[in-house]
Amino acid sequence: MNKPIVGILGFSDGDATAHKMLAPIVQKQIDVIVEALKKDGRIEVIVASDIVHSDKTAKGLAEELKAKGVDGTIFVNAVFAFPAFSVIAAKNGKGPYLLAAPIYPDWPGMVSMLAAGGGLDHEGIDHFRVAGDFNDPEVLEKTVTFAKCAMVVSRLNGQKYGLIGGRSLGMYSSTVSMQEWMEKFGIDVEHIDQLEIVRKADEVDEAQVEKAFQWLTDNVGKIEYNGTSFTPEKLKTQIRHYEATKKIIEENELDFVGVKCHYEMSAHYCTQCLSAAFLNDPYDWDGSKEPFVCACEADSDAALTMQILKMLTGDPVIFMDVRHWDQANGVMEFCNCGSQSTYYAAKSDDYKENLANVTLYPALDLYPGGGCHVNLQTKPGKATIARLCRRKKNGETRYYMTIIPCEFVELPKEREALTTKEWPHVFAKLPFEHQVFLERFGANHCHAVYGDHVDELKMICRMLNVDVEMYE
């Protein structure tokens, strides 16, 4: 996983004599911060070549760090520095910005941070603050969280999303405005026809298909061929579609994708379930790889939510449907129509352990193109569910993210047959009454990763000017 890169910019007094006296104090605090971050090892730091002590140095040093590709910038306030310098630097540098001040009585660094923050507020420049000793684990963790979130926001800008196909099954909440995405997130939307998958599937090398087929045969727990809609040859067709999709991603330099599937592909060629599973996985038959976000049914806000979660954690992300409230077990059942990252079958770094818990079932008769669905049950653990949605109110449409901390639990395998046994299942304990979820949630799809990432997602939303919605 790539590390965040943060710039470190120290601020001093604008009076030449005072600056000469105060510069060593500022430098000492810069050194403390840099040493703590380097020792921790989760962040790469780039320190400005000088300390800000004038309008010109504020502009020039901020531009210097921006040119070096930082994801965000830490403003170091160790003494009382002219607050105007922070405003000038923020106007010309690379945000998001974290104002950092030590807490000690010798010098008014905290005063400087508050004055600088007030100036940024006046200019409408949102920012974050941390005060204390950077060797304090709590202060360090706040800084690392800022850096991780800044990296997600910074690196989303300039990405390219591949919308393969169009709106699926009439789902309004799956479509987005390419102009809005560019303006708000800096993401370009590239429309690609699904026929490209079919065309490129014919070009896939047969040796690669046989390699993949043998790997699946050797490692997947069960492959339930039925002799009609799901045969070895149909599985090979799905392999070709996966390889074709990878080629489309490579040739178009895509960063994440959504694939329509229903019904053109699922009715006439095959389901895209194998692609949705192994693109999101950290492995395939060619070995270890970075998970690549693929959203089913061309749900673009799903894909963006998943991309944020993947960039934040480095982990595969679950795509799931909100399917059923199980009153008897007190769990919400999430069950996507056909596929999910197989990593969650055992949450193991060993693909063999994961795939041993996977079953490839024949696609439902609803999808006459045939092929397989990818069945598994997600292993227990603390997790975070998230979903970007949009709401129009008083003529203004705003993005918001629903964030739900939860606990994945395991139920007997036979319980899956209550809904659709062929599909992947996630059972989750929610921290609120399920009626709240059903009354307020703004989509039929949601997404999840292991771990508690609520605070990080809240910070990312603030950086993106996205509202946060949490249920109680």
Regions found by a protein language model. Give the residues of each.
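Cofactor- and metal-binding active-site motifs of prokaryotic enzymes
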Residues: 51-157, 168-170
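Conserved anion/nucleotide-ligand pocket segment
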Residues: 8, 148-180, 184-187, 328-354
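N-terminal small/polar loop signature for handling phosphorylated ligands or for N-terminal nucleophile
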Residues: 48-91, 205-252
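Short Gly/Thr/Asp-enriched flexible loops that form oxyanion-binding sites at enzyme active sites
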Residues: 81-94, 266-284, 425-429
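N-terminal glycine-rich anion-binding loop in soluble enzyme alpha/beta folds
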Residues: 1-51, 173-224
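Long, internal scaffold/assembly segments composed of regular secondary structure
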Residues: 215, 219-312
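A glycine-rich phosphate-binding loop feature that marks nucleotide/adenosyl-phosphate handling sites
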Residues: 258-266, 321-339
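Extended hydrophobic packing segments that form well-structured cores
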Residues: 359-472
